[in-house]
Design a protein with these regions (language model features):
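Membrane-embedded alpha-helical signal segments
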Residues: 1-186
Length: 186
């Protein structure tokens, strides 16, 4: 049986997302609010503006108090949306929606004790299509290639193939060149 509804336990939620999206280009960071409530943000590397995400989302949320003396959550997602500067955000309640949004270039904010997720539109998608490289002219076959750095190329693939089955593994090869390469597969 596949679990699709989000738990109130942030650790269970994070483990579920890591298992469903095990590719190394799906990243996350954790932080706590002022009163110690754990939060986690998941995003696809190269598809999100990390600086804006940290400055305009994580920092303001970490300055909030989410609990009162009785341990109940006072601050709702609407309140969090007021304290962050991203106008594009929405609440979702299933893992399928979370995964679809993360693969689409949005960020997912999990909060311990909350059984829904705030999707934050902090997209920074690559702006060009995969095209023929100027120095590698093919006589036969497809005329598509990658000409940017490896992270941009990975995000171009992720932008085109929005599936949780896409995997990346990055490694260094070559004694002289010490070149970063990425192996991609479905």
């Amino acid at each position: 049986m596949v679990v699709n509804h989000i738990s109130k336990n942030i650790q269970k939620n994070c483990n579920y997302i890591k298992n469903r999206l095990p590719s190394e280009d799906i990243l996350h960071f954790t932080f706590n609010t002022l009163d110690g409530v754990a939060c986690a943000i998941f995003y696809a590397d190269g598809m999100v503006n990390k600086e804006l995400l940290g400055e305009l989302v994580a920092r303001p949320i970490s300055a909030l108090k989410l609990k009162n003396e009785g341990g109940m959550y006072e601050t709702t997602f609407e309140n969090i949306q007021k304290n962050t500067l991203f106008p594009e955000s929405k609440e979702v309640k299933t893992f399928d929606e979370v995964i679809r949004e993360v693969l689409d270039g949005n960020s997912a904010l999990f909060i311990d004790g909350v059984s829904s997720v705030l999707i934050i539109g902090a997209k920074l998608l690559p702006v060009r299509a995969v095209m023929e490289p100027p120095t590698d002219i093919a006589v036969k076959g497809p005329r598509e290639g990658f000409i940017e750095d490896i992270k941009t190329n990975m995000s171009l693939i992720r932008k085109r193939l929005k599936t949780p089955d896409l995997r990346f593994e990055t490694l260094r090869v070559g004694k002289q060149s010490d070149t970063m390469v990425s192996i991609c597969w479905l």
